[in-house]
């Protein structure tokens, strides 16, 4: 099989298929027993899946009509969609209890296959199933049906558009032409589960093929279609697991959240009248739980410190460094049946087991971590559960390695356990939740940390306790944040040491703080991809930019909406390189569907503009089939082109978040909360700046009152170079000059005279007099009211003299008027003046100054924004504008830095500092320290020269985090100097 057919190693771990029956009886002695055989498999889709799907398709209808209640209560026809779904599920569960018994676990394993952690991954994907079906049905792979199965990602040669992008539906089309049976089969749910257990244990095609062949012989096409959806764990039945759990038992969702065990939900909660005992609401050894999460950053440190709930007796809170790794829980129990006497299991935040990667015992040959934990626990420790972060550690640099290298490092450690230089996994533990049979989640964090320090013996750079600092004020947080900036760390986490551990909850007891970088909105946003746009030029033929959405919360959802519905939010086309595009294609292949404007997928995606369908994508994808990407942006702006009425300005791709699915992507309400926090923070910063300015204001002596434009007795010094540029011209100068150079009225008159011109004190004293003014004085207003005289700004006089000086030796040339030279223009003059500059206001006749270039006209800004928007629609940014709006510093290679460069290096507008990839940690820390010592100032990105080169090659600005310099222990820095 190729990479498109079989799951990656991490998704197909070598773990047991399930517990033996005797072990199950011992573990669950009071589990319910069914009194009769399970229902036939076809009952699942005939009485559950199909009815739920029909509810999803039908319009909701008028509220008043649906709310009519007859004399015998409310009929199913009068229920709203959510109530009708519950009604269908309730009837199925009621029938199961009556005809089968109280053990609904066999059915739930097929209804919610993605929640079944007891059955291993099958290790096969769509292409492998297609190949086996071609063999089973003896179809020519080059035939129409063979092509449709093996190339299901492409539009079928004759398949219905309804099945395009739906592999199970494509299989139904093909199987329907050559079924082994047309009526439903006789396989029971229990029998299907047994066969699926065998299929999950099979690792080769010759083992999988006979199992799939038996399903083909005993099922009709519709049964096989649903079976394939179960194998792929892509059910799409029109109801979420929350609805099923809620109907089954009021404590079901809670128990699943703390155990991630579908089996426990079904067996321990089989009686809806018996609620969970208090002791059963906590965590259990060797059962995965959903961990506590840190709350999002708030608008001010003062508020965050207040949320730590300090008291007079105990005002302390803790500061921890935020690690850039994968959240991991470790379970350990004494077990004499395992070599070494200890059994281990590892789970990620999303309940994915990684025991196969890190080890199940001290002598596990595949254990990239556990082989080092022989002496990692204190005497007397029999069992524990630890919460921490698994990161990649680079022993050569003695520093964390970049995000995304963890699994590679773990696999490398498995293959070469004696390497002392290769990257390795390091578990940083920050909490203990269970010790020697006692649940510690109800104890305070301070007490849990004491227990952790007594129970664990750290193993250097393999298994360590994550340090913390005690603090009482926001100043200490700011100091820690400056240290984070200097060390290029992820951020901080503030923790309340008086708080219990809150399972499956994002609470203010833990709050994350991140440094704010130049040119960025603040928080990285994890957005779900819901649409794609084909590119042009080098990007042509593929989806090169993506429509991202915000998950709709219950509070924003319309009645009857899909649980996975999203609002359109922004288009992202910048920051992707070739590998990023390939990775997204790999995870979404075959799941894209062409957007049909006549039948838009409003159950999943809601665009702006209603029927106009603003920013309509070329292709769309269901949120549950899609990927989550991390996006950075310059700011948030209003836009009627996106459903929320807001969008991101200049969004840029950072990385793919494979640790998240659509359910954990950013929701509408979460984004609005983040936006509110950022805006409040900016307001407070502006207020602080204003207050500090007021403190520094100095009193100045009052100037004597003068009449503007009238100062005849002023002593005029030399006003500038002399020449003949104004020979034969008459001037009436009304005011002084304020820009680009300040000159008094007499100084301007002297400048005119020195260059061959004559000046007068009225506009009627000589013919064709040029009137000059920079402010609307009484005389200037009078001339303007007459409307028959052009009034020129003094800047034209200054520009003429300056250009004549630049062109010394050439014939004198009088500059034509430009729009910037006109204080007032008579009718018809505007077009003449406008023709003397380009679309950006750049003169055709004179040299543009650096001051004018730095003061970018609004037209250029708008053009840049249009070009940036075109990037997000699949076009390329012109190379010359790739680094527009950035201020990049290239430090000098010499140790002796000039005073001017030292001043430049601390300039507040610097966004990036480019250094040599081999620079030492000493030099890098010194660079970061320059900005970390400046409170309130945004931090520039420190990157290697590879960022410039790779961005240039990719024709887009790539994420800076990928190009951060490695941190070394010693040595002399080698700053990069171009050329």
From Swiss-Prot:
Residue sites binding Mg(2+) 2 per the record: 490
SUPFAM superfamilies with a match to the protein in the record: BRCT domain, DNA ligase/mRNA capping enzyme, catalytic domain, Nucleic acid-binding proteins
Annotated binding of Mg(2+) 1, by residue: 389
Residues at the active site: 322 (n6-amp-lysine intermediate)
Listed Gene3D superfamilies: BRCT domain, DNA ligase, ATP-dependent, N-terminal domain, DNA ligase/mRNA capping enzyme, Nucleic acid-binding proteins
Annotated positions binding ATP: 320, 322-323, 327, 389, 430, 490, 495, 512, 514
Pfam family, one: DNA_ligase_A_M
Annotated EC: 6.5.1.1
Segments passing through the bilayer: none
Protein name: DNA ligase 4
PANTHER family cross-referenced by the UniProt entry: DNA LIGASE 4 (PTHR45997:SF1)
GO molecular function annotation: ATP binding; DNA binding; DNA ligase (ATP) activity; metal ion binding
